[in-house]
């Protein structure tokens, strides 16, 4: 990952919910590592969902969403981000490539399905199936997150998405 705002640099927004030191934070760090490892000129804006807003979403050329599963749903912080940004960006973010990663105590499908339904309203383009990490975070799960970050970075840089 490179810093700066050169026009050739692709821009990824990574938003996430969860608690400091939690499993989702471990996954976020791995996704960031994957983006950083890319040879492509990428600018990453990584923010807790409660701090991200309309300007961040309009800035993004790719979106990664990390959330814990809370009671079979996405985190309140991620839902709040979507509630605050939907109408202000309506009609302005169609086709935005996105992917989701979820730390789940259950099966994670409720959170994944809810985000997918909302993404249809935004008219985003899903670039990968939801990455659901059930239970403890393993090295294999971290590797999948690294690969998700690399996929987004490479896909944007190569014009695939």
What are the language-model segments listed below?
Residues 2-36:
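N-terminal beta1-alpha1 ligand-phosphate binding loop
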Residues 2-8, 38, 53, 126-161:
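Glycine-rich phosphate/pyrophosphate-binding loop and the adjoining helix
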Residues 13, 43-45, 99:
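A structural signal for isolated positions on well-ordered beta-strands in alpha/beta enzyme cores
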Residues 18-21, 103-107, 132-138:
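Short histidine/acidic/glycine/proline-rich micro-motifs that form metal-
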Residues 24-27, 77, 111, 141-144:
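Residues at alpha-helix caps and immediate loop-helix transition turns in enzyme cores, especially N-
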Residues 28-41, 120-125:
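Short helix-loop-beta junction
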Residues 40-51:
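A short beta-strand-loop structural module common to alpha/beta enzyme folds
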Residues 49-126:
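Helix-loop-strand module that forms the ligand-binding subsite of alpha/beta enzymes
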């Amino acid at each position: 990952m490179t810093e700066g705002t050169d026009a050739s640099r692709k821009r990824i927004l990574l938003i996430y919910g969860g608690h400091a030191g939690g499993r989702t934070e471990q996954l976020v760090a791995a996704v960031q590592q994957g983006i950083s490892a890319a040879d492509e000129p990428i600018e990453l804006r990584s923010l807790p969902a409660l701090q991200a807003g309309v300007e961040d979403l309009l800035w993004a050329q790719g979106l990664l969403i990390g959330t814990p599963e809370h009671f079979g749903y996405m985190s309140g912080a991620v839902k709040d981000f979507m509630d605050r940004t939907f109408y202000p960006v309506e009609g302005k973010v169609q086709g935005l490539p996105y992917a989701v990663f979820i730390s789940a105590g259950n099966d994670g499908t409720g959170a994944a399905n809810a985000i997918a339904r909302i993404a249809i309203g935004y008219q985003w383009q899903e670039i990968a199936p939801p990455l659901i990490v059930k239970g403890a975070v393993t090295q294999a799960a971290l590797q999948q997150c690294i690969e998700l970050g690399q996929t987004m970075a490479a896909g944007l840089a190569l014009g695939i998405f």
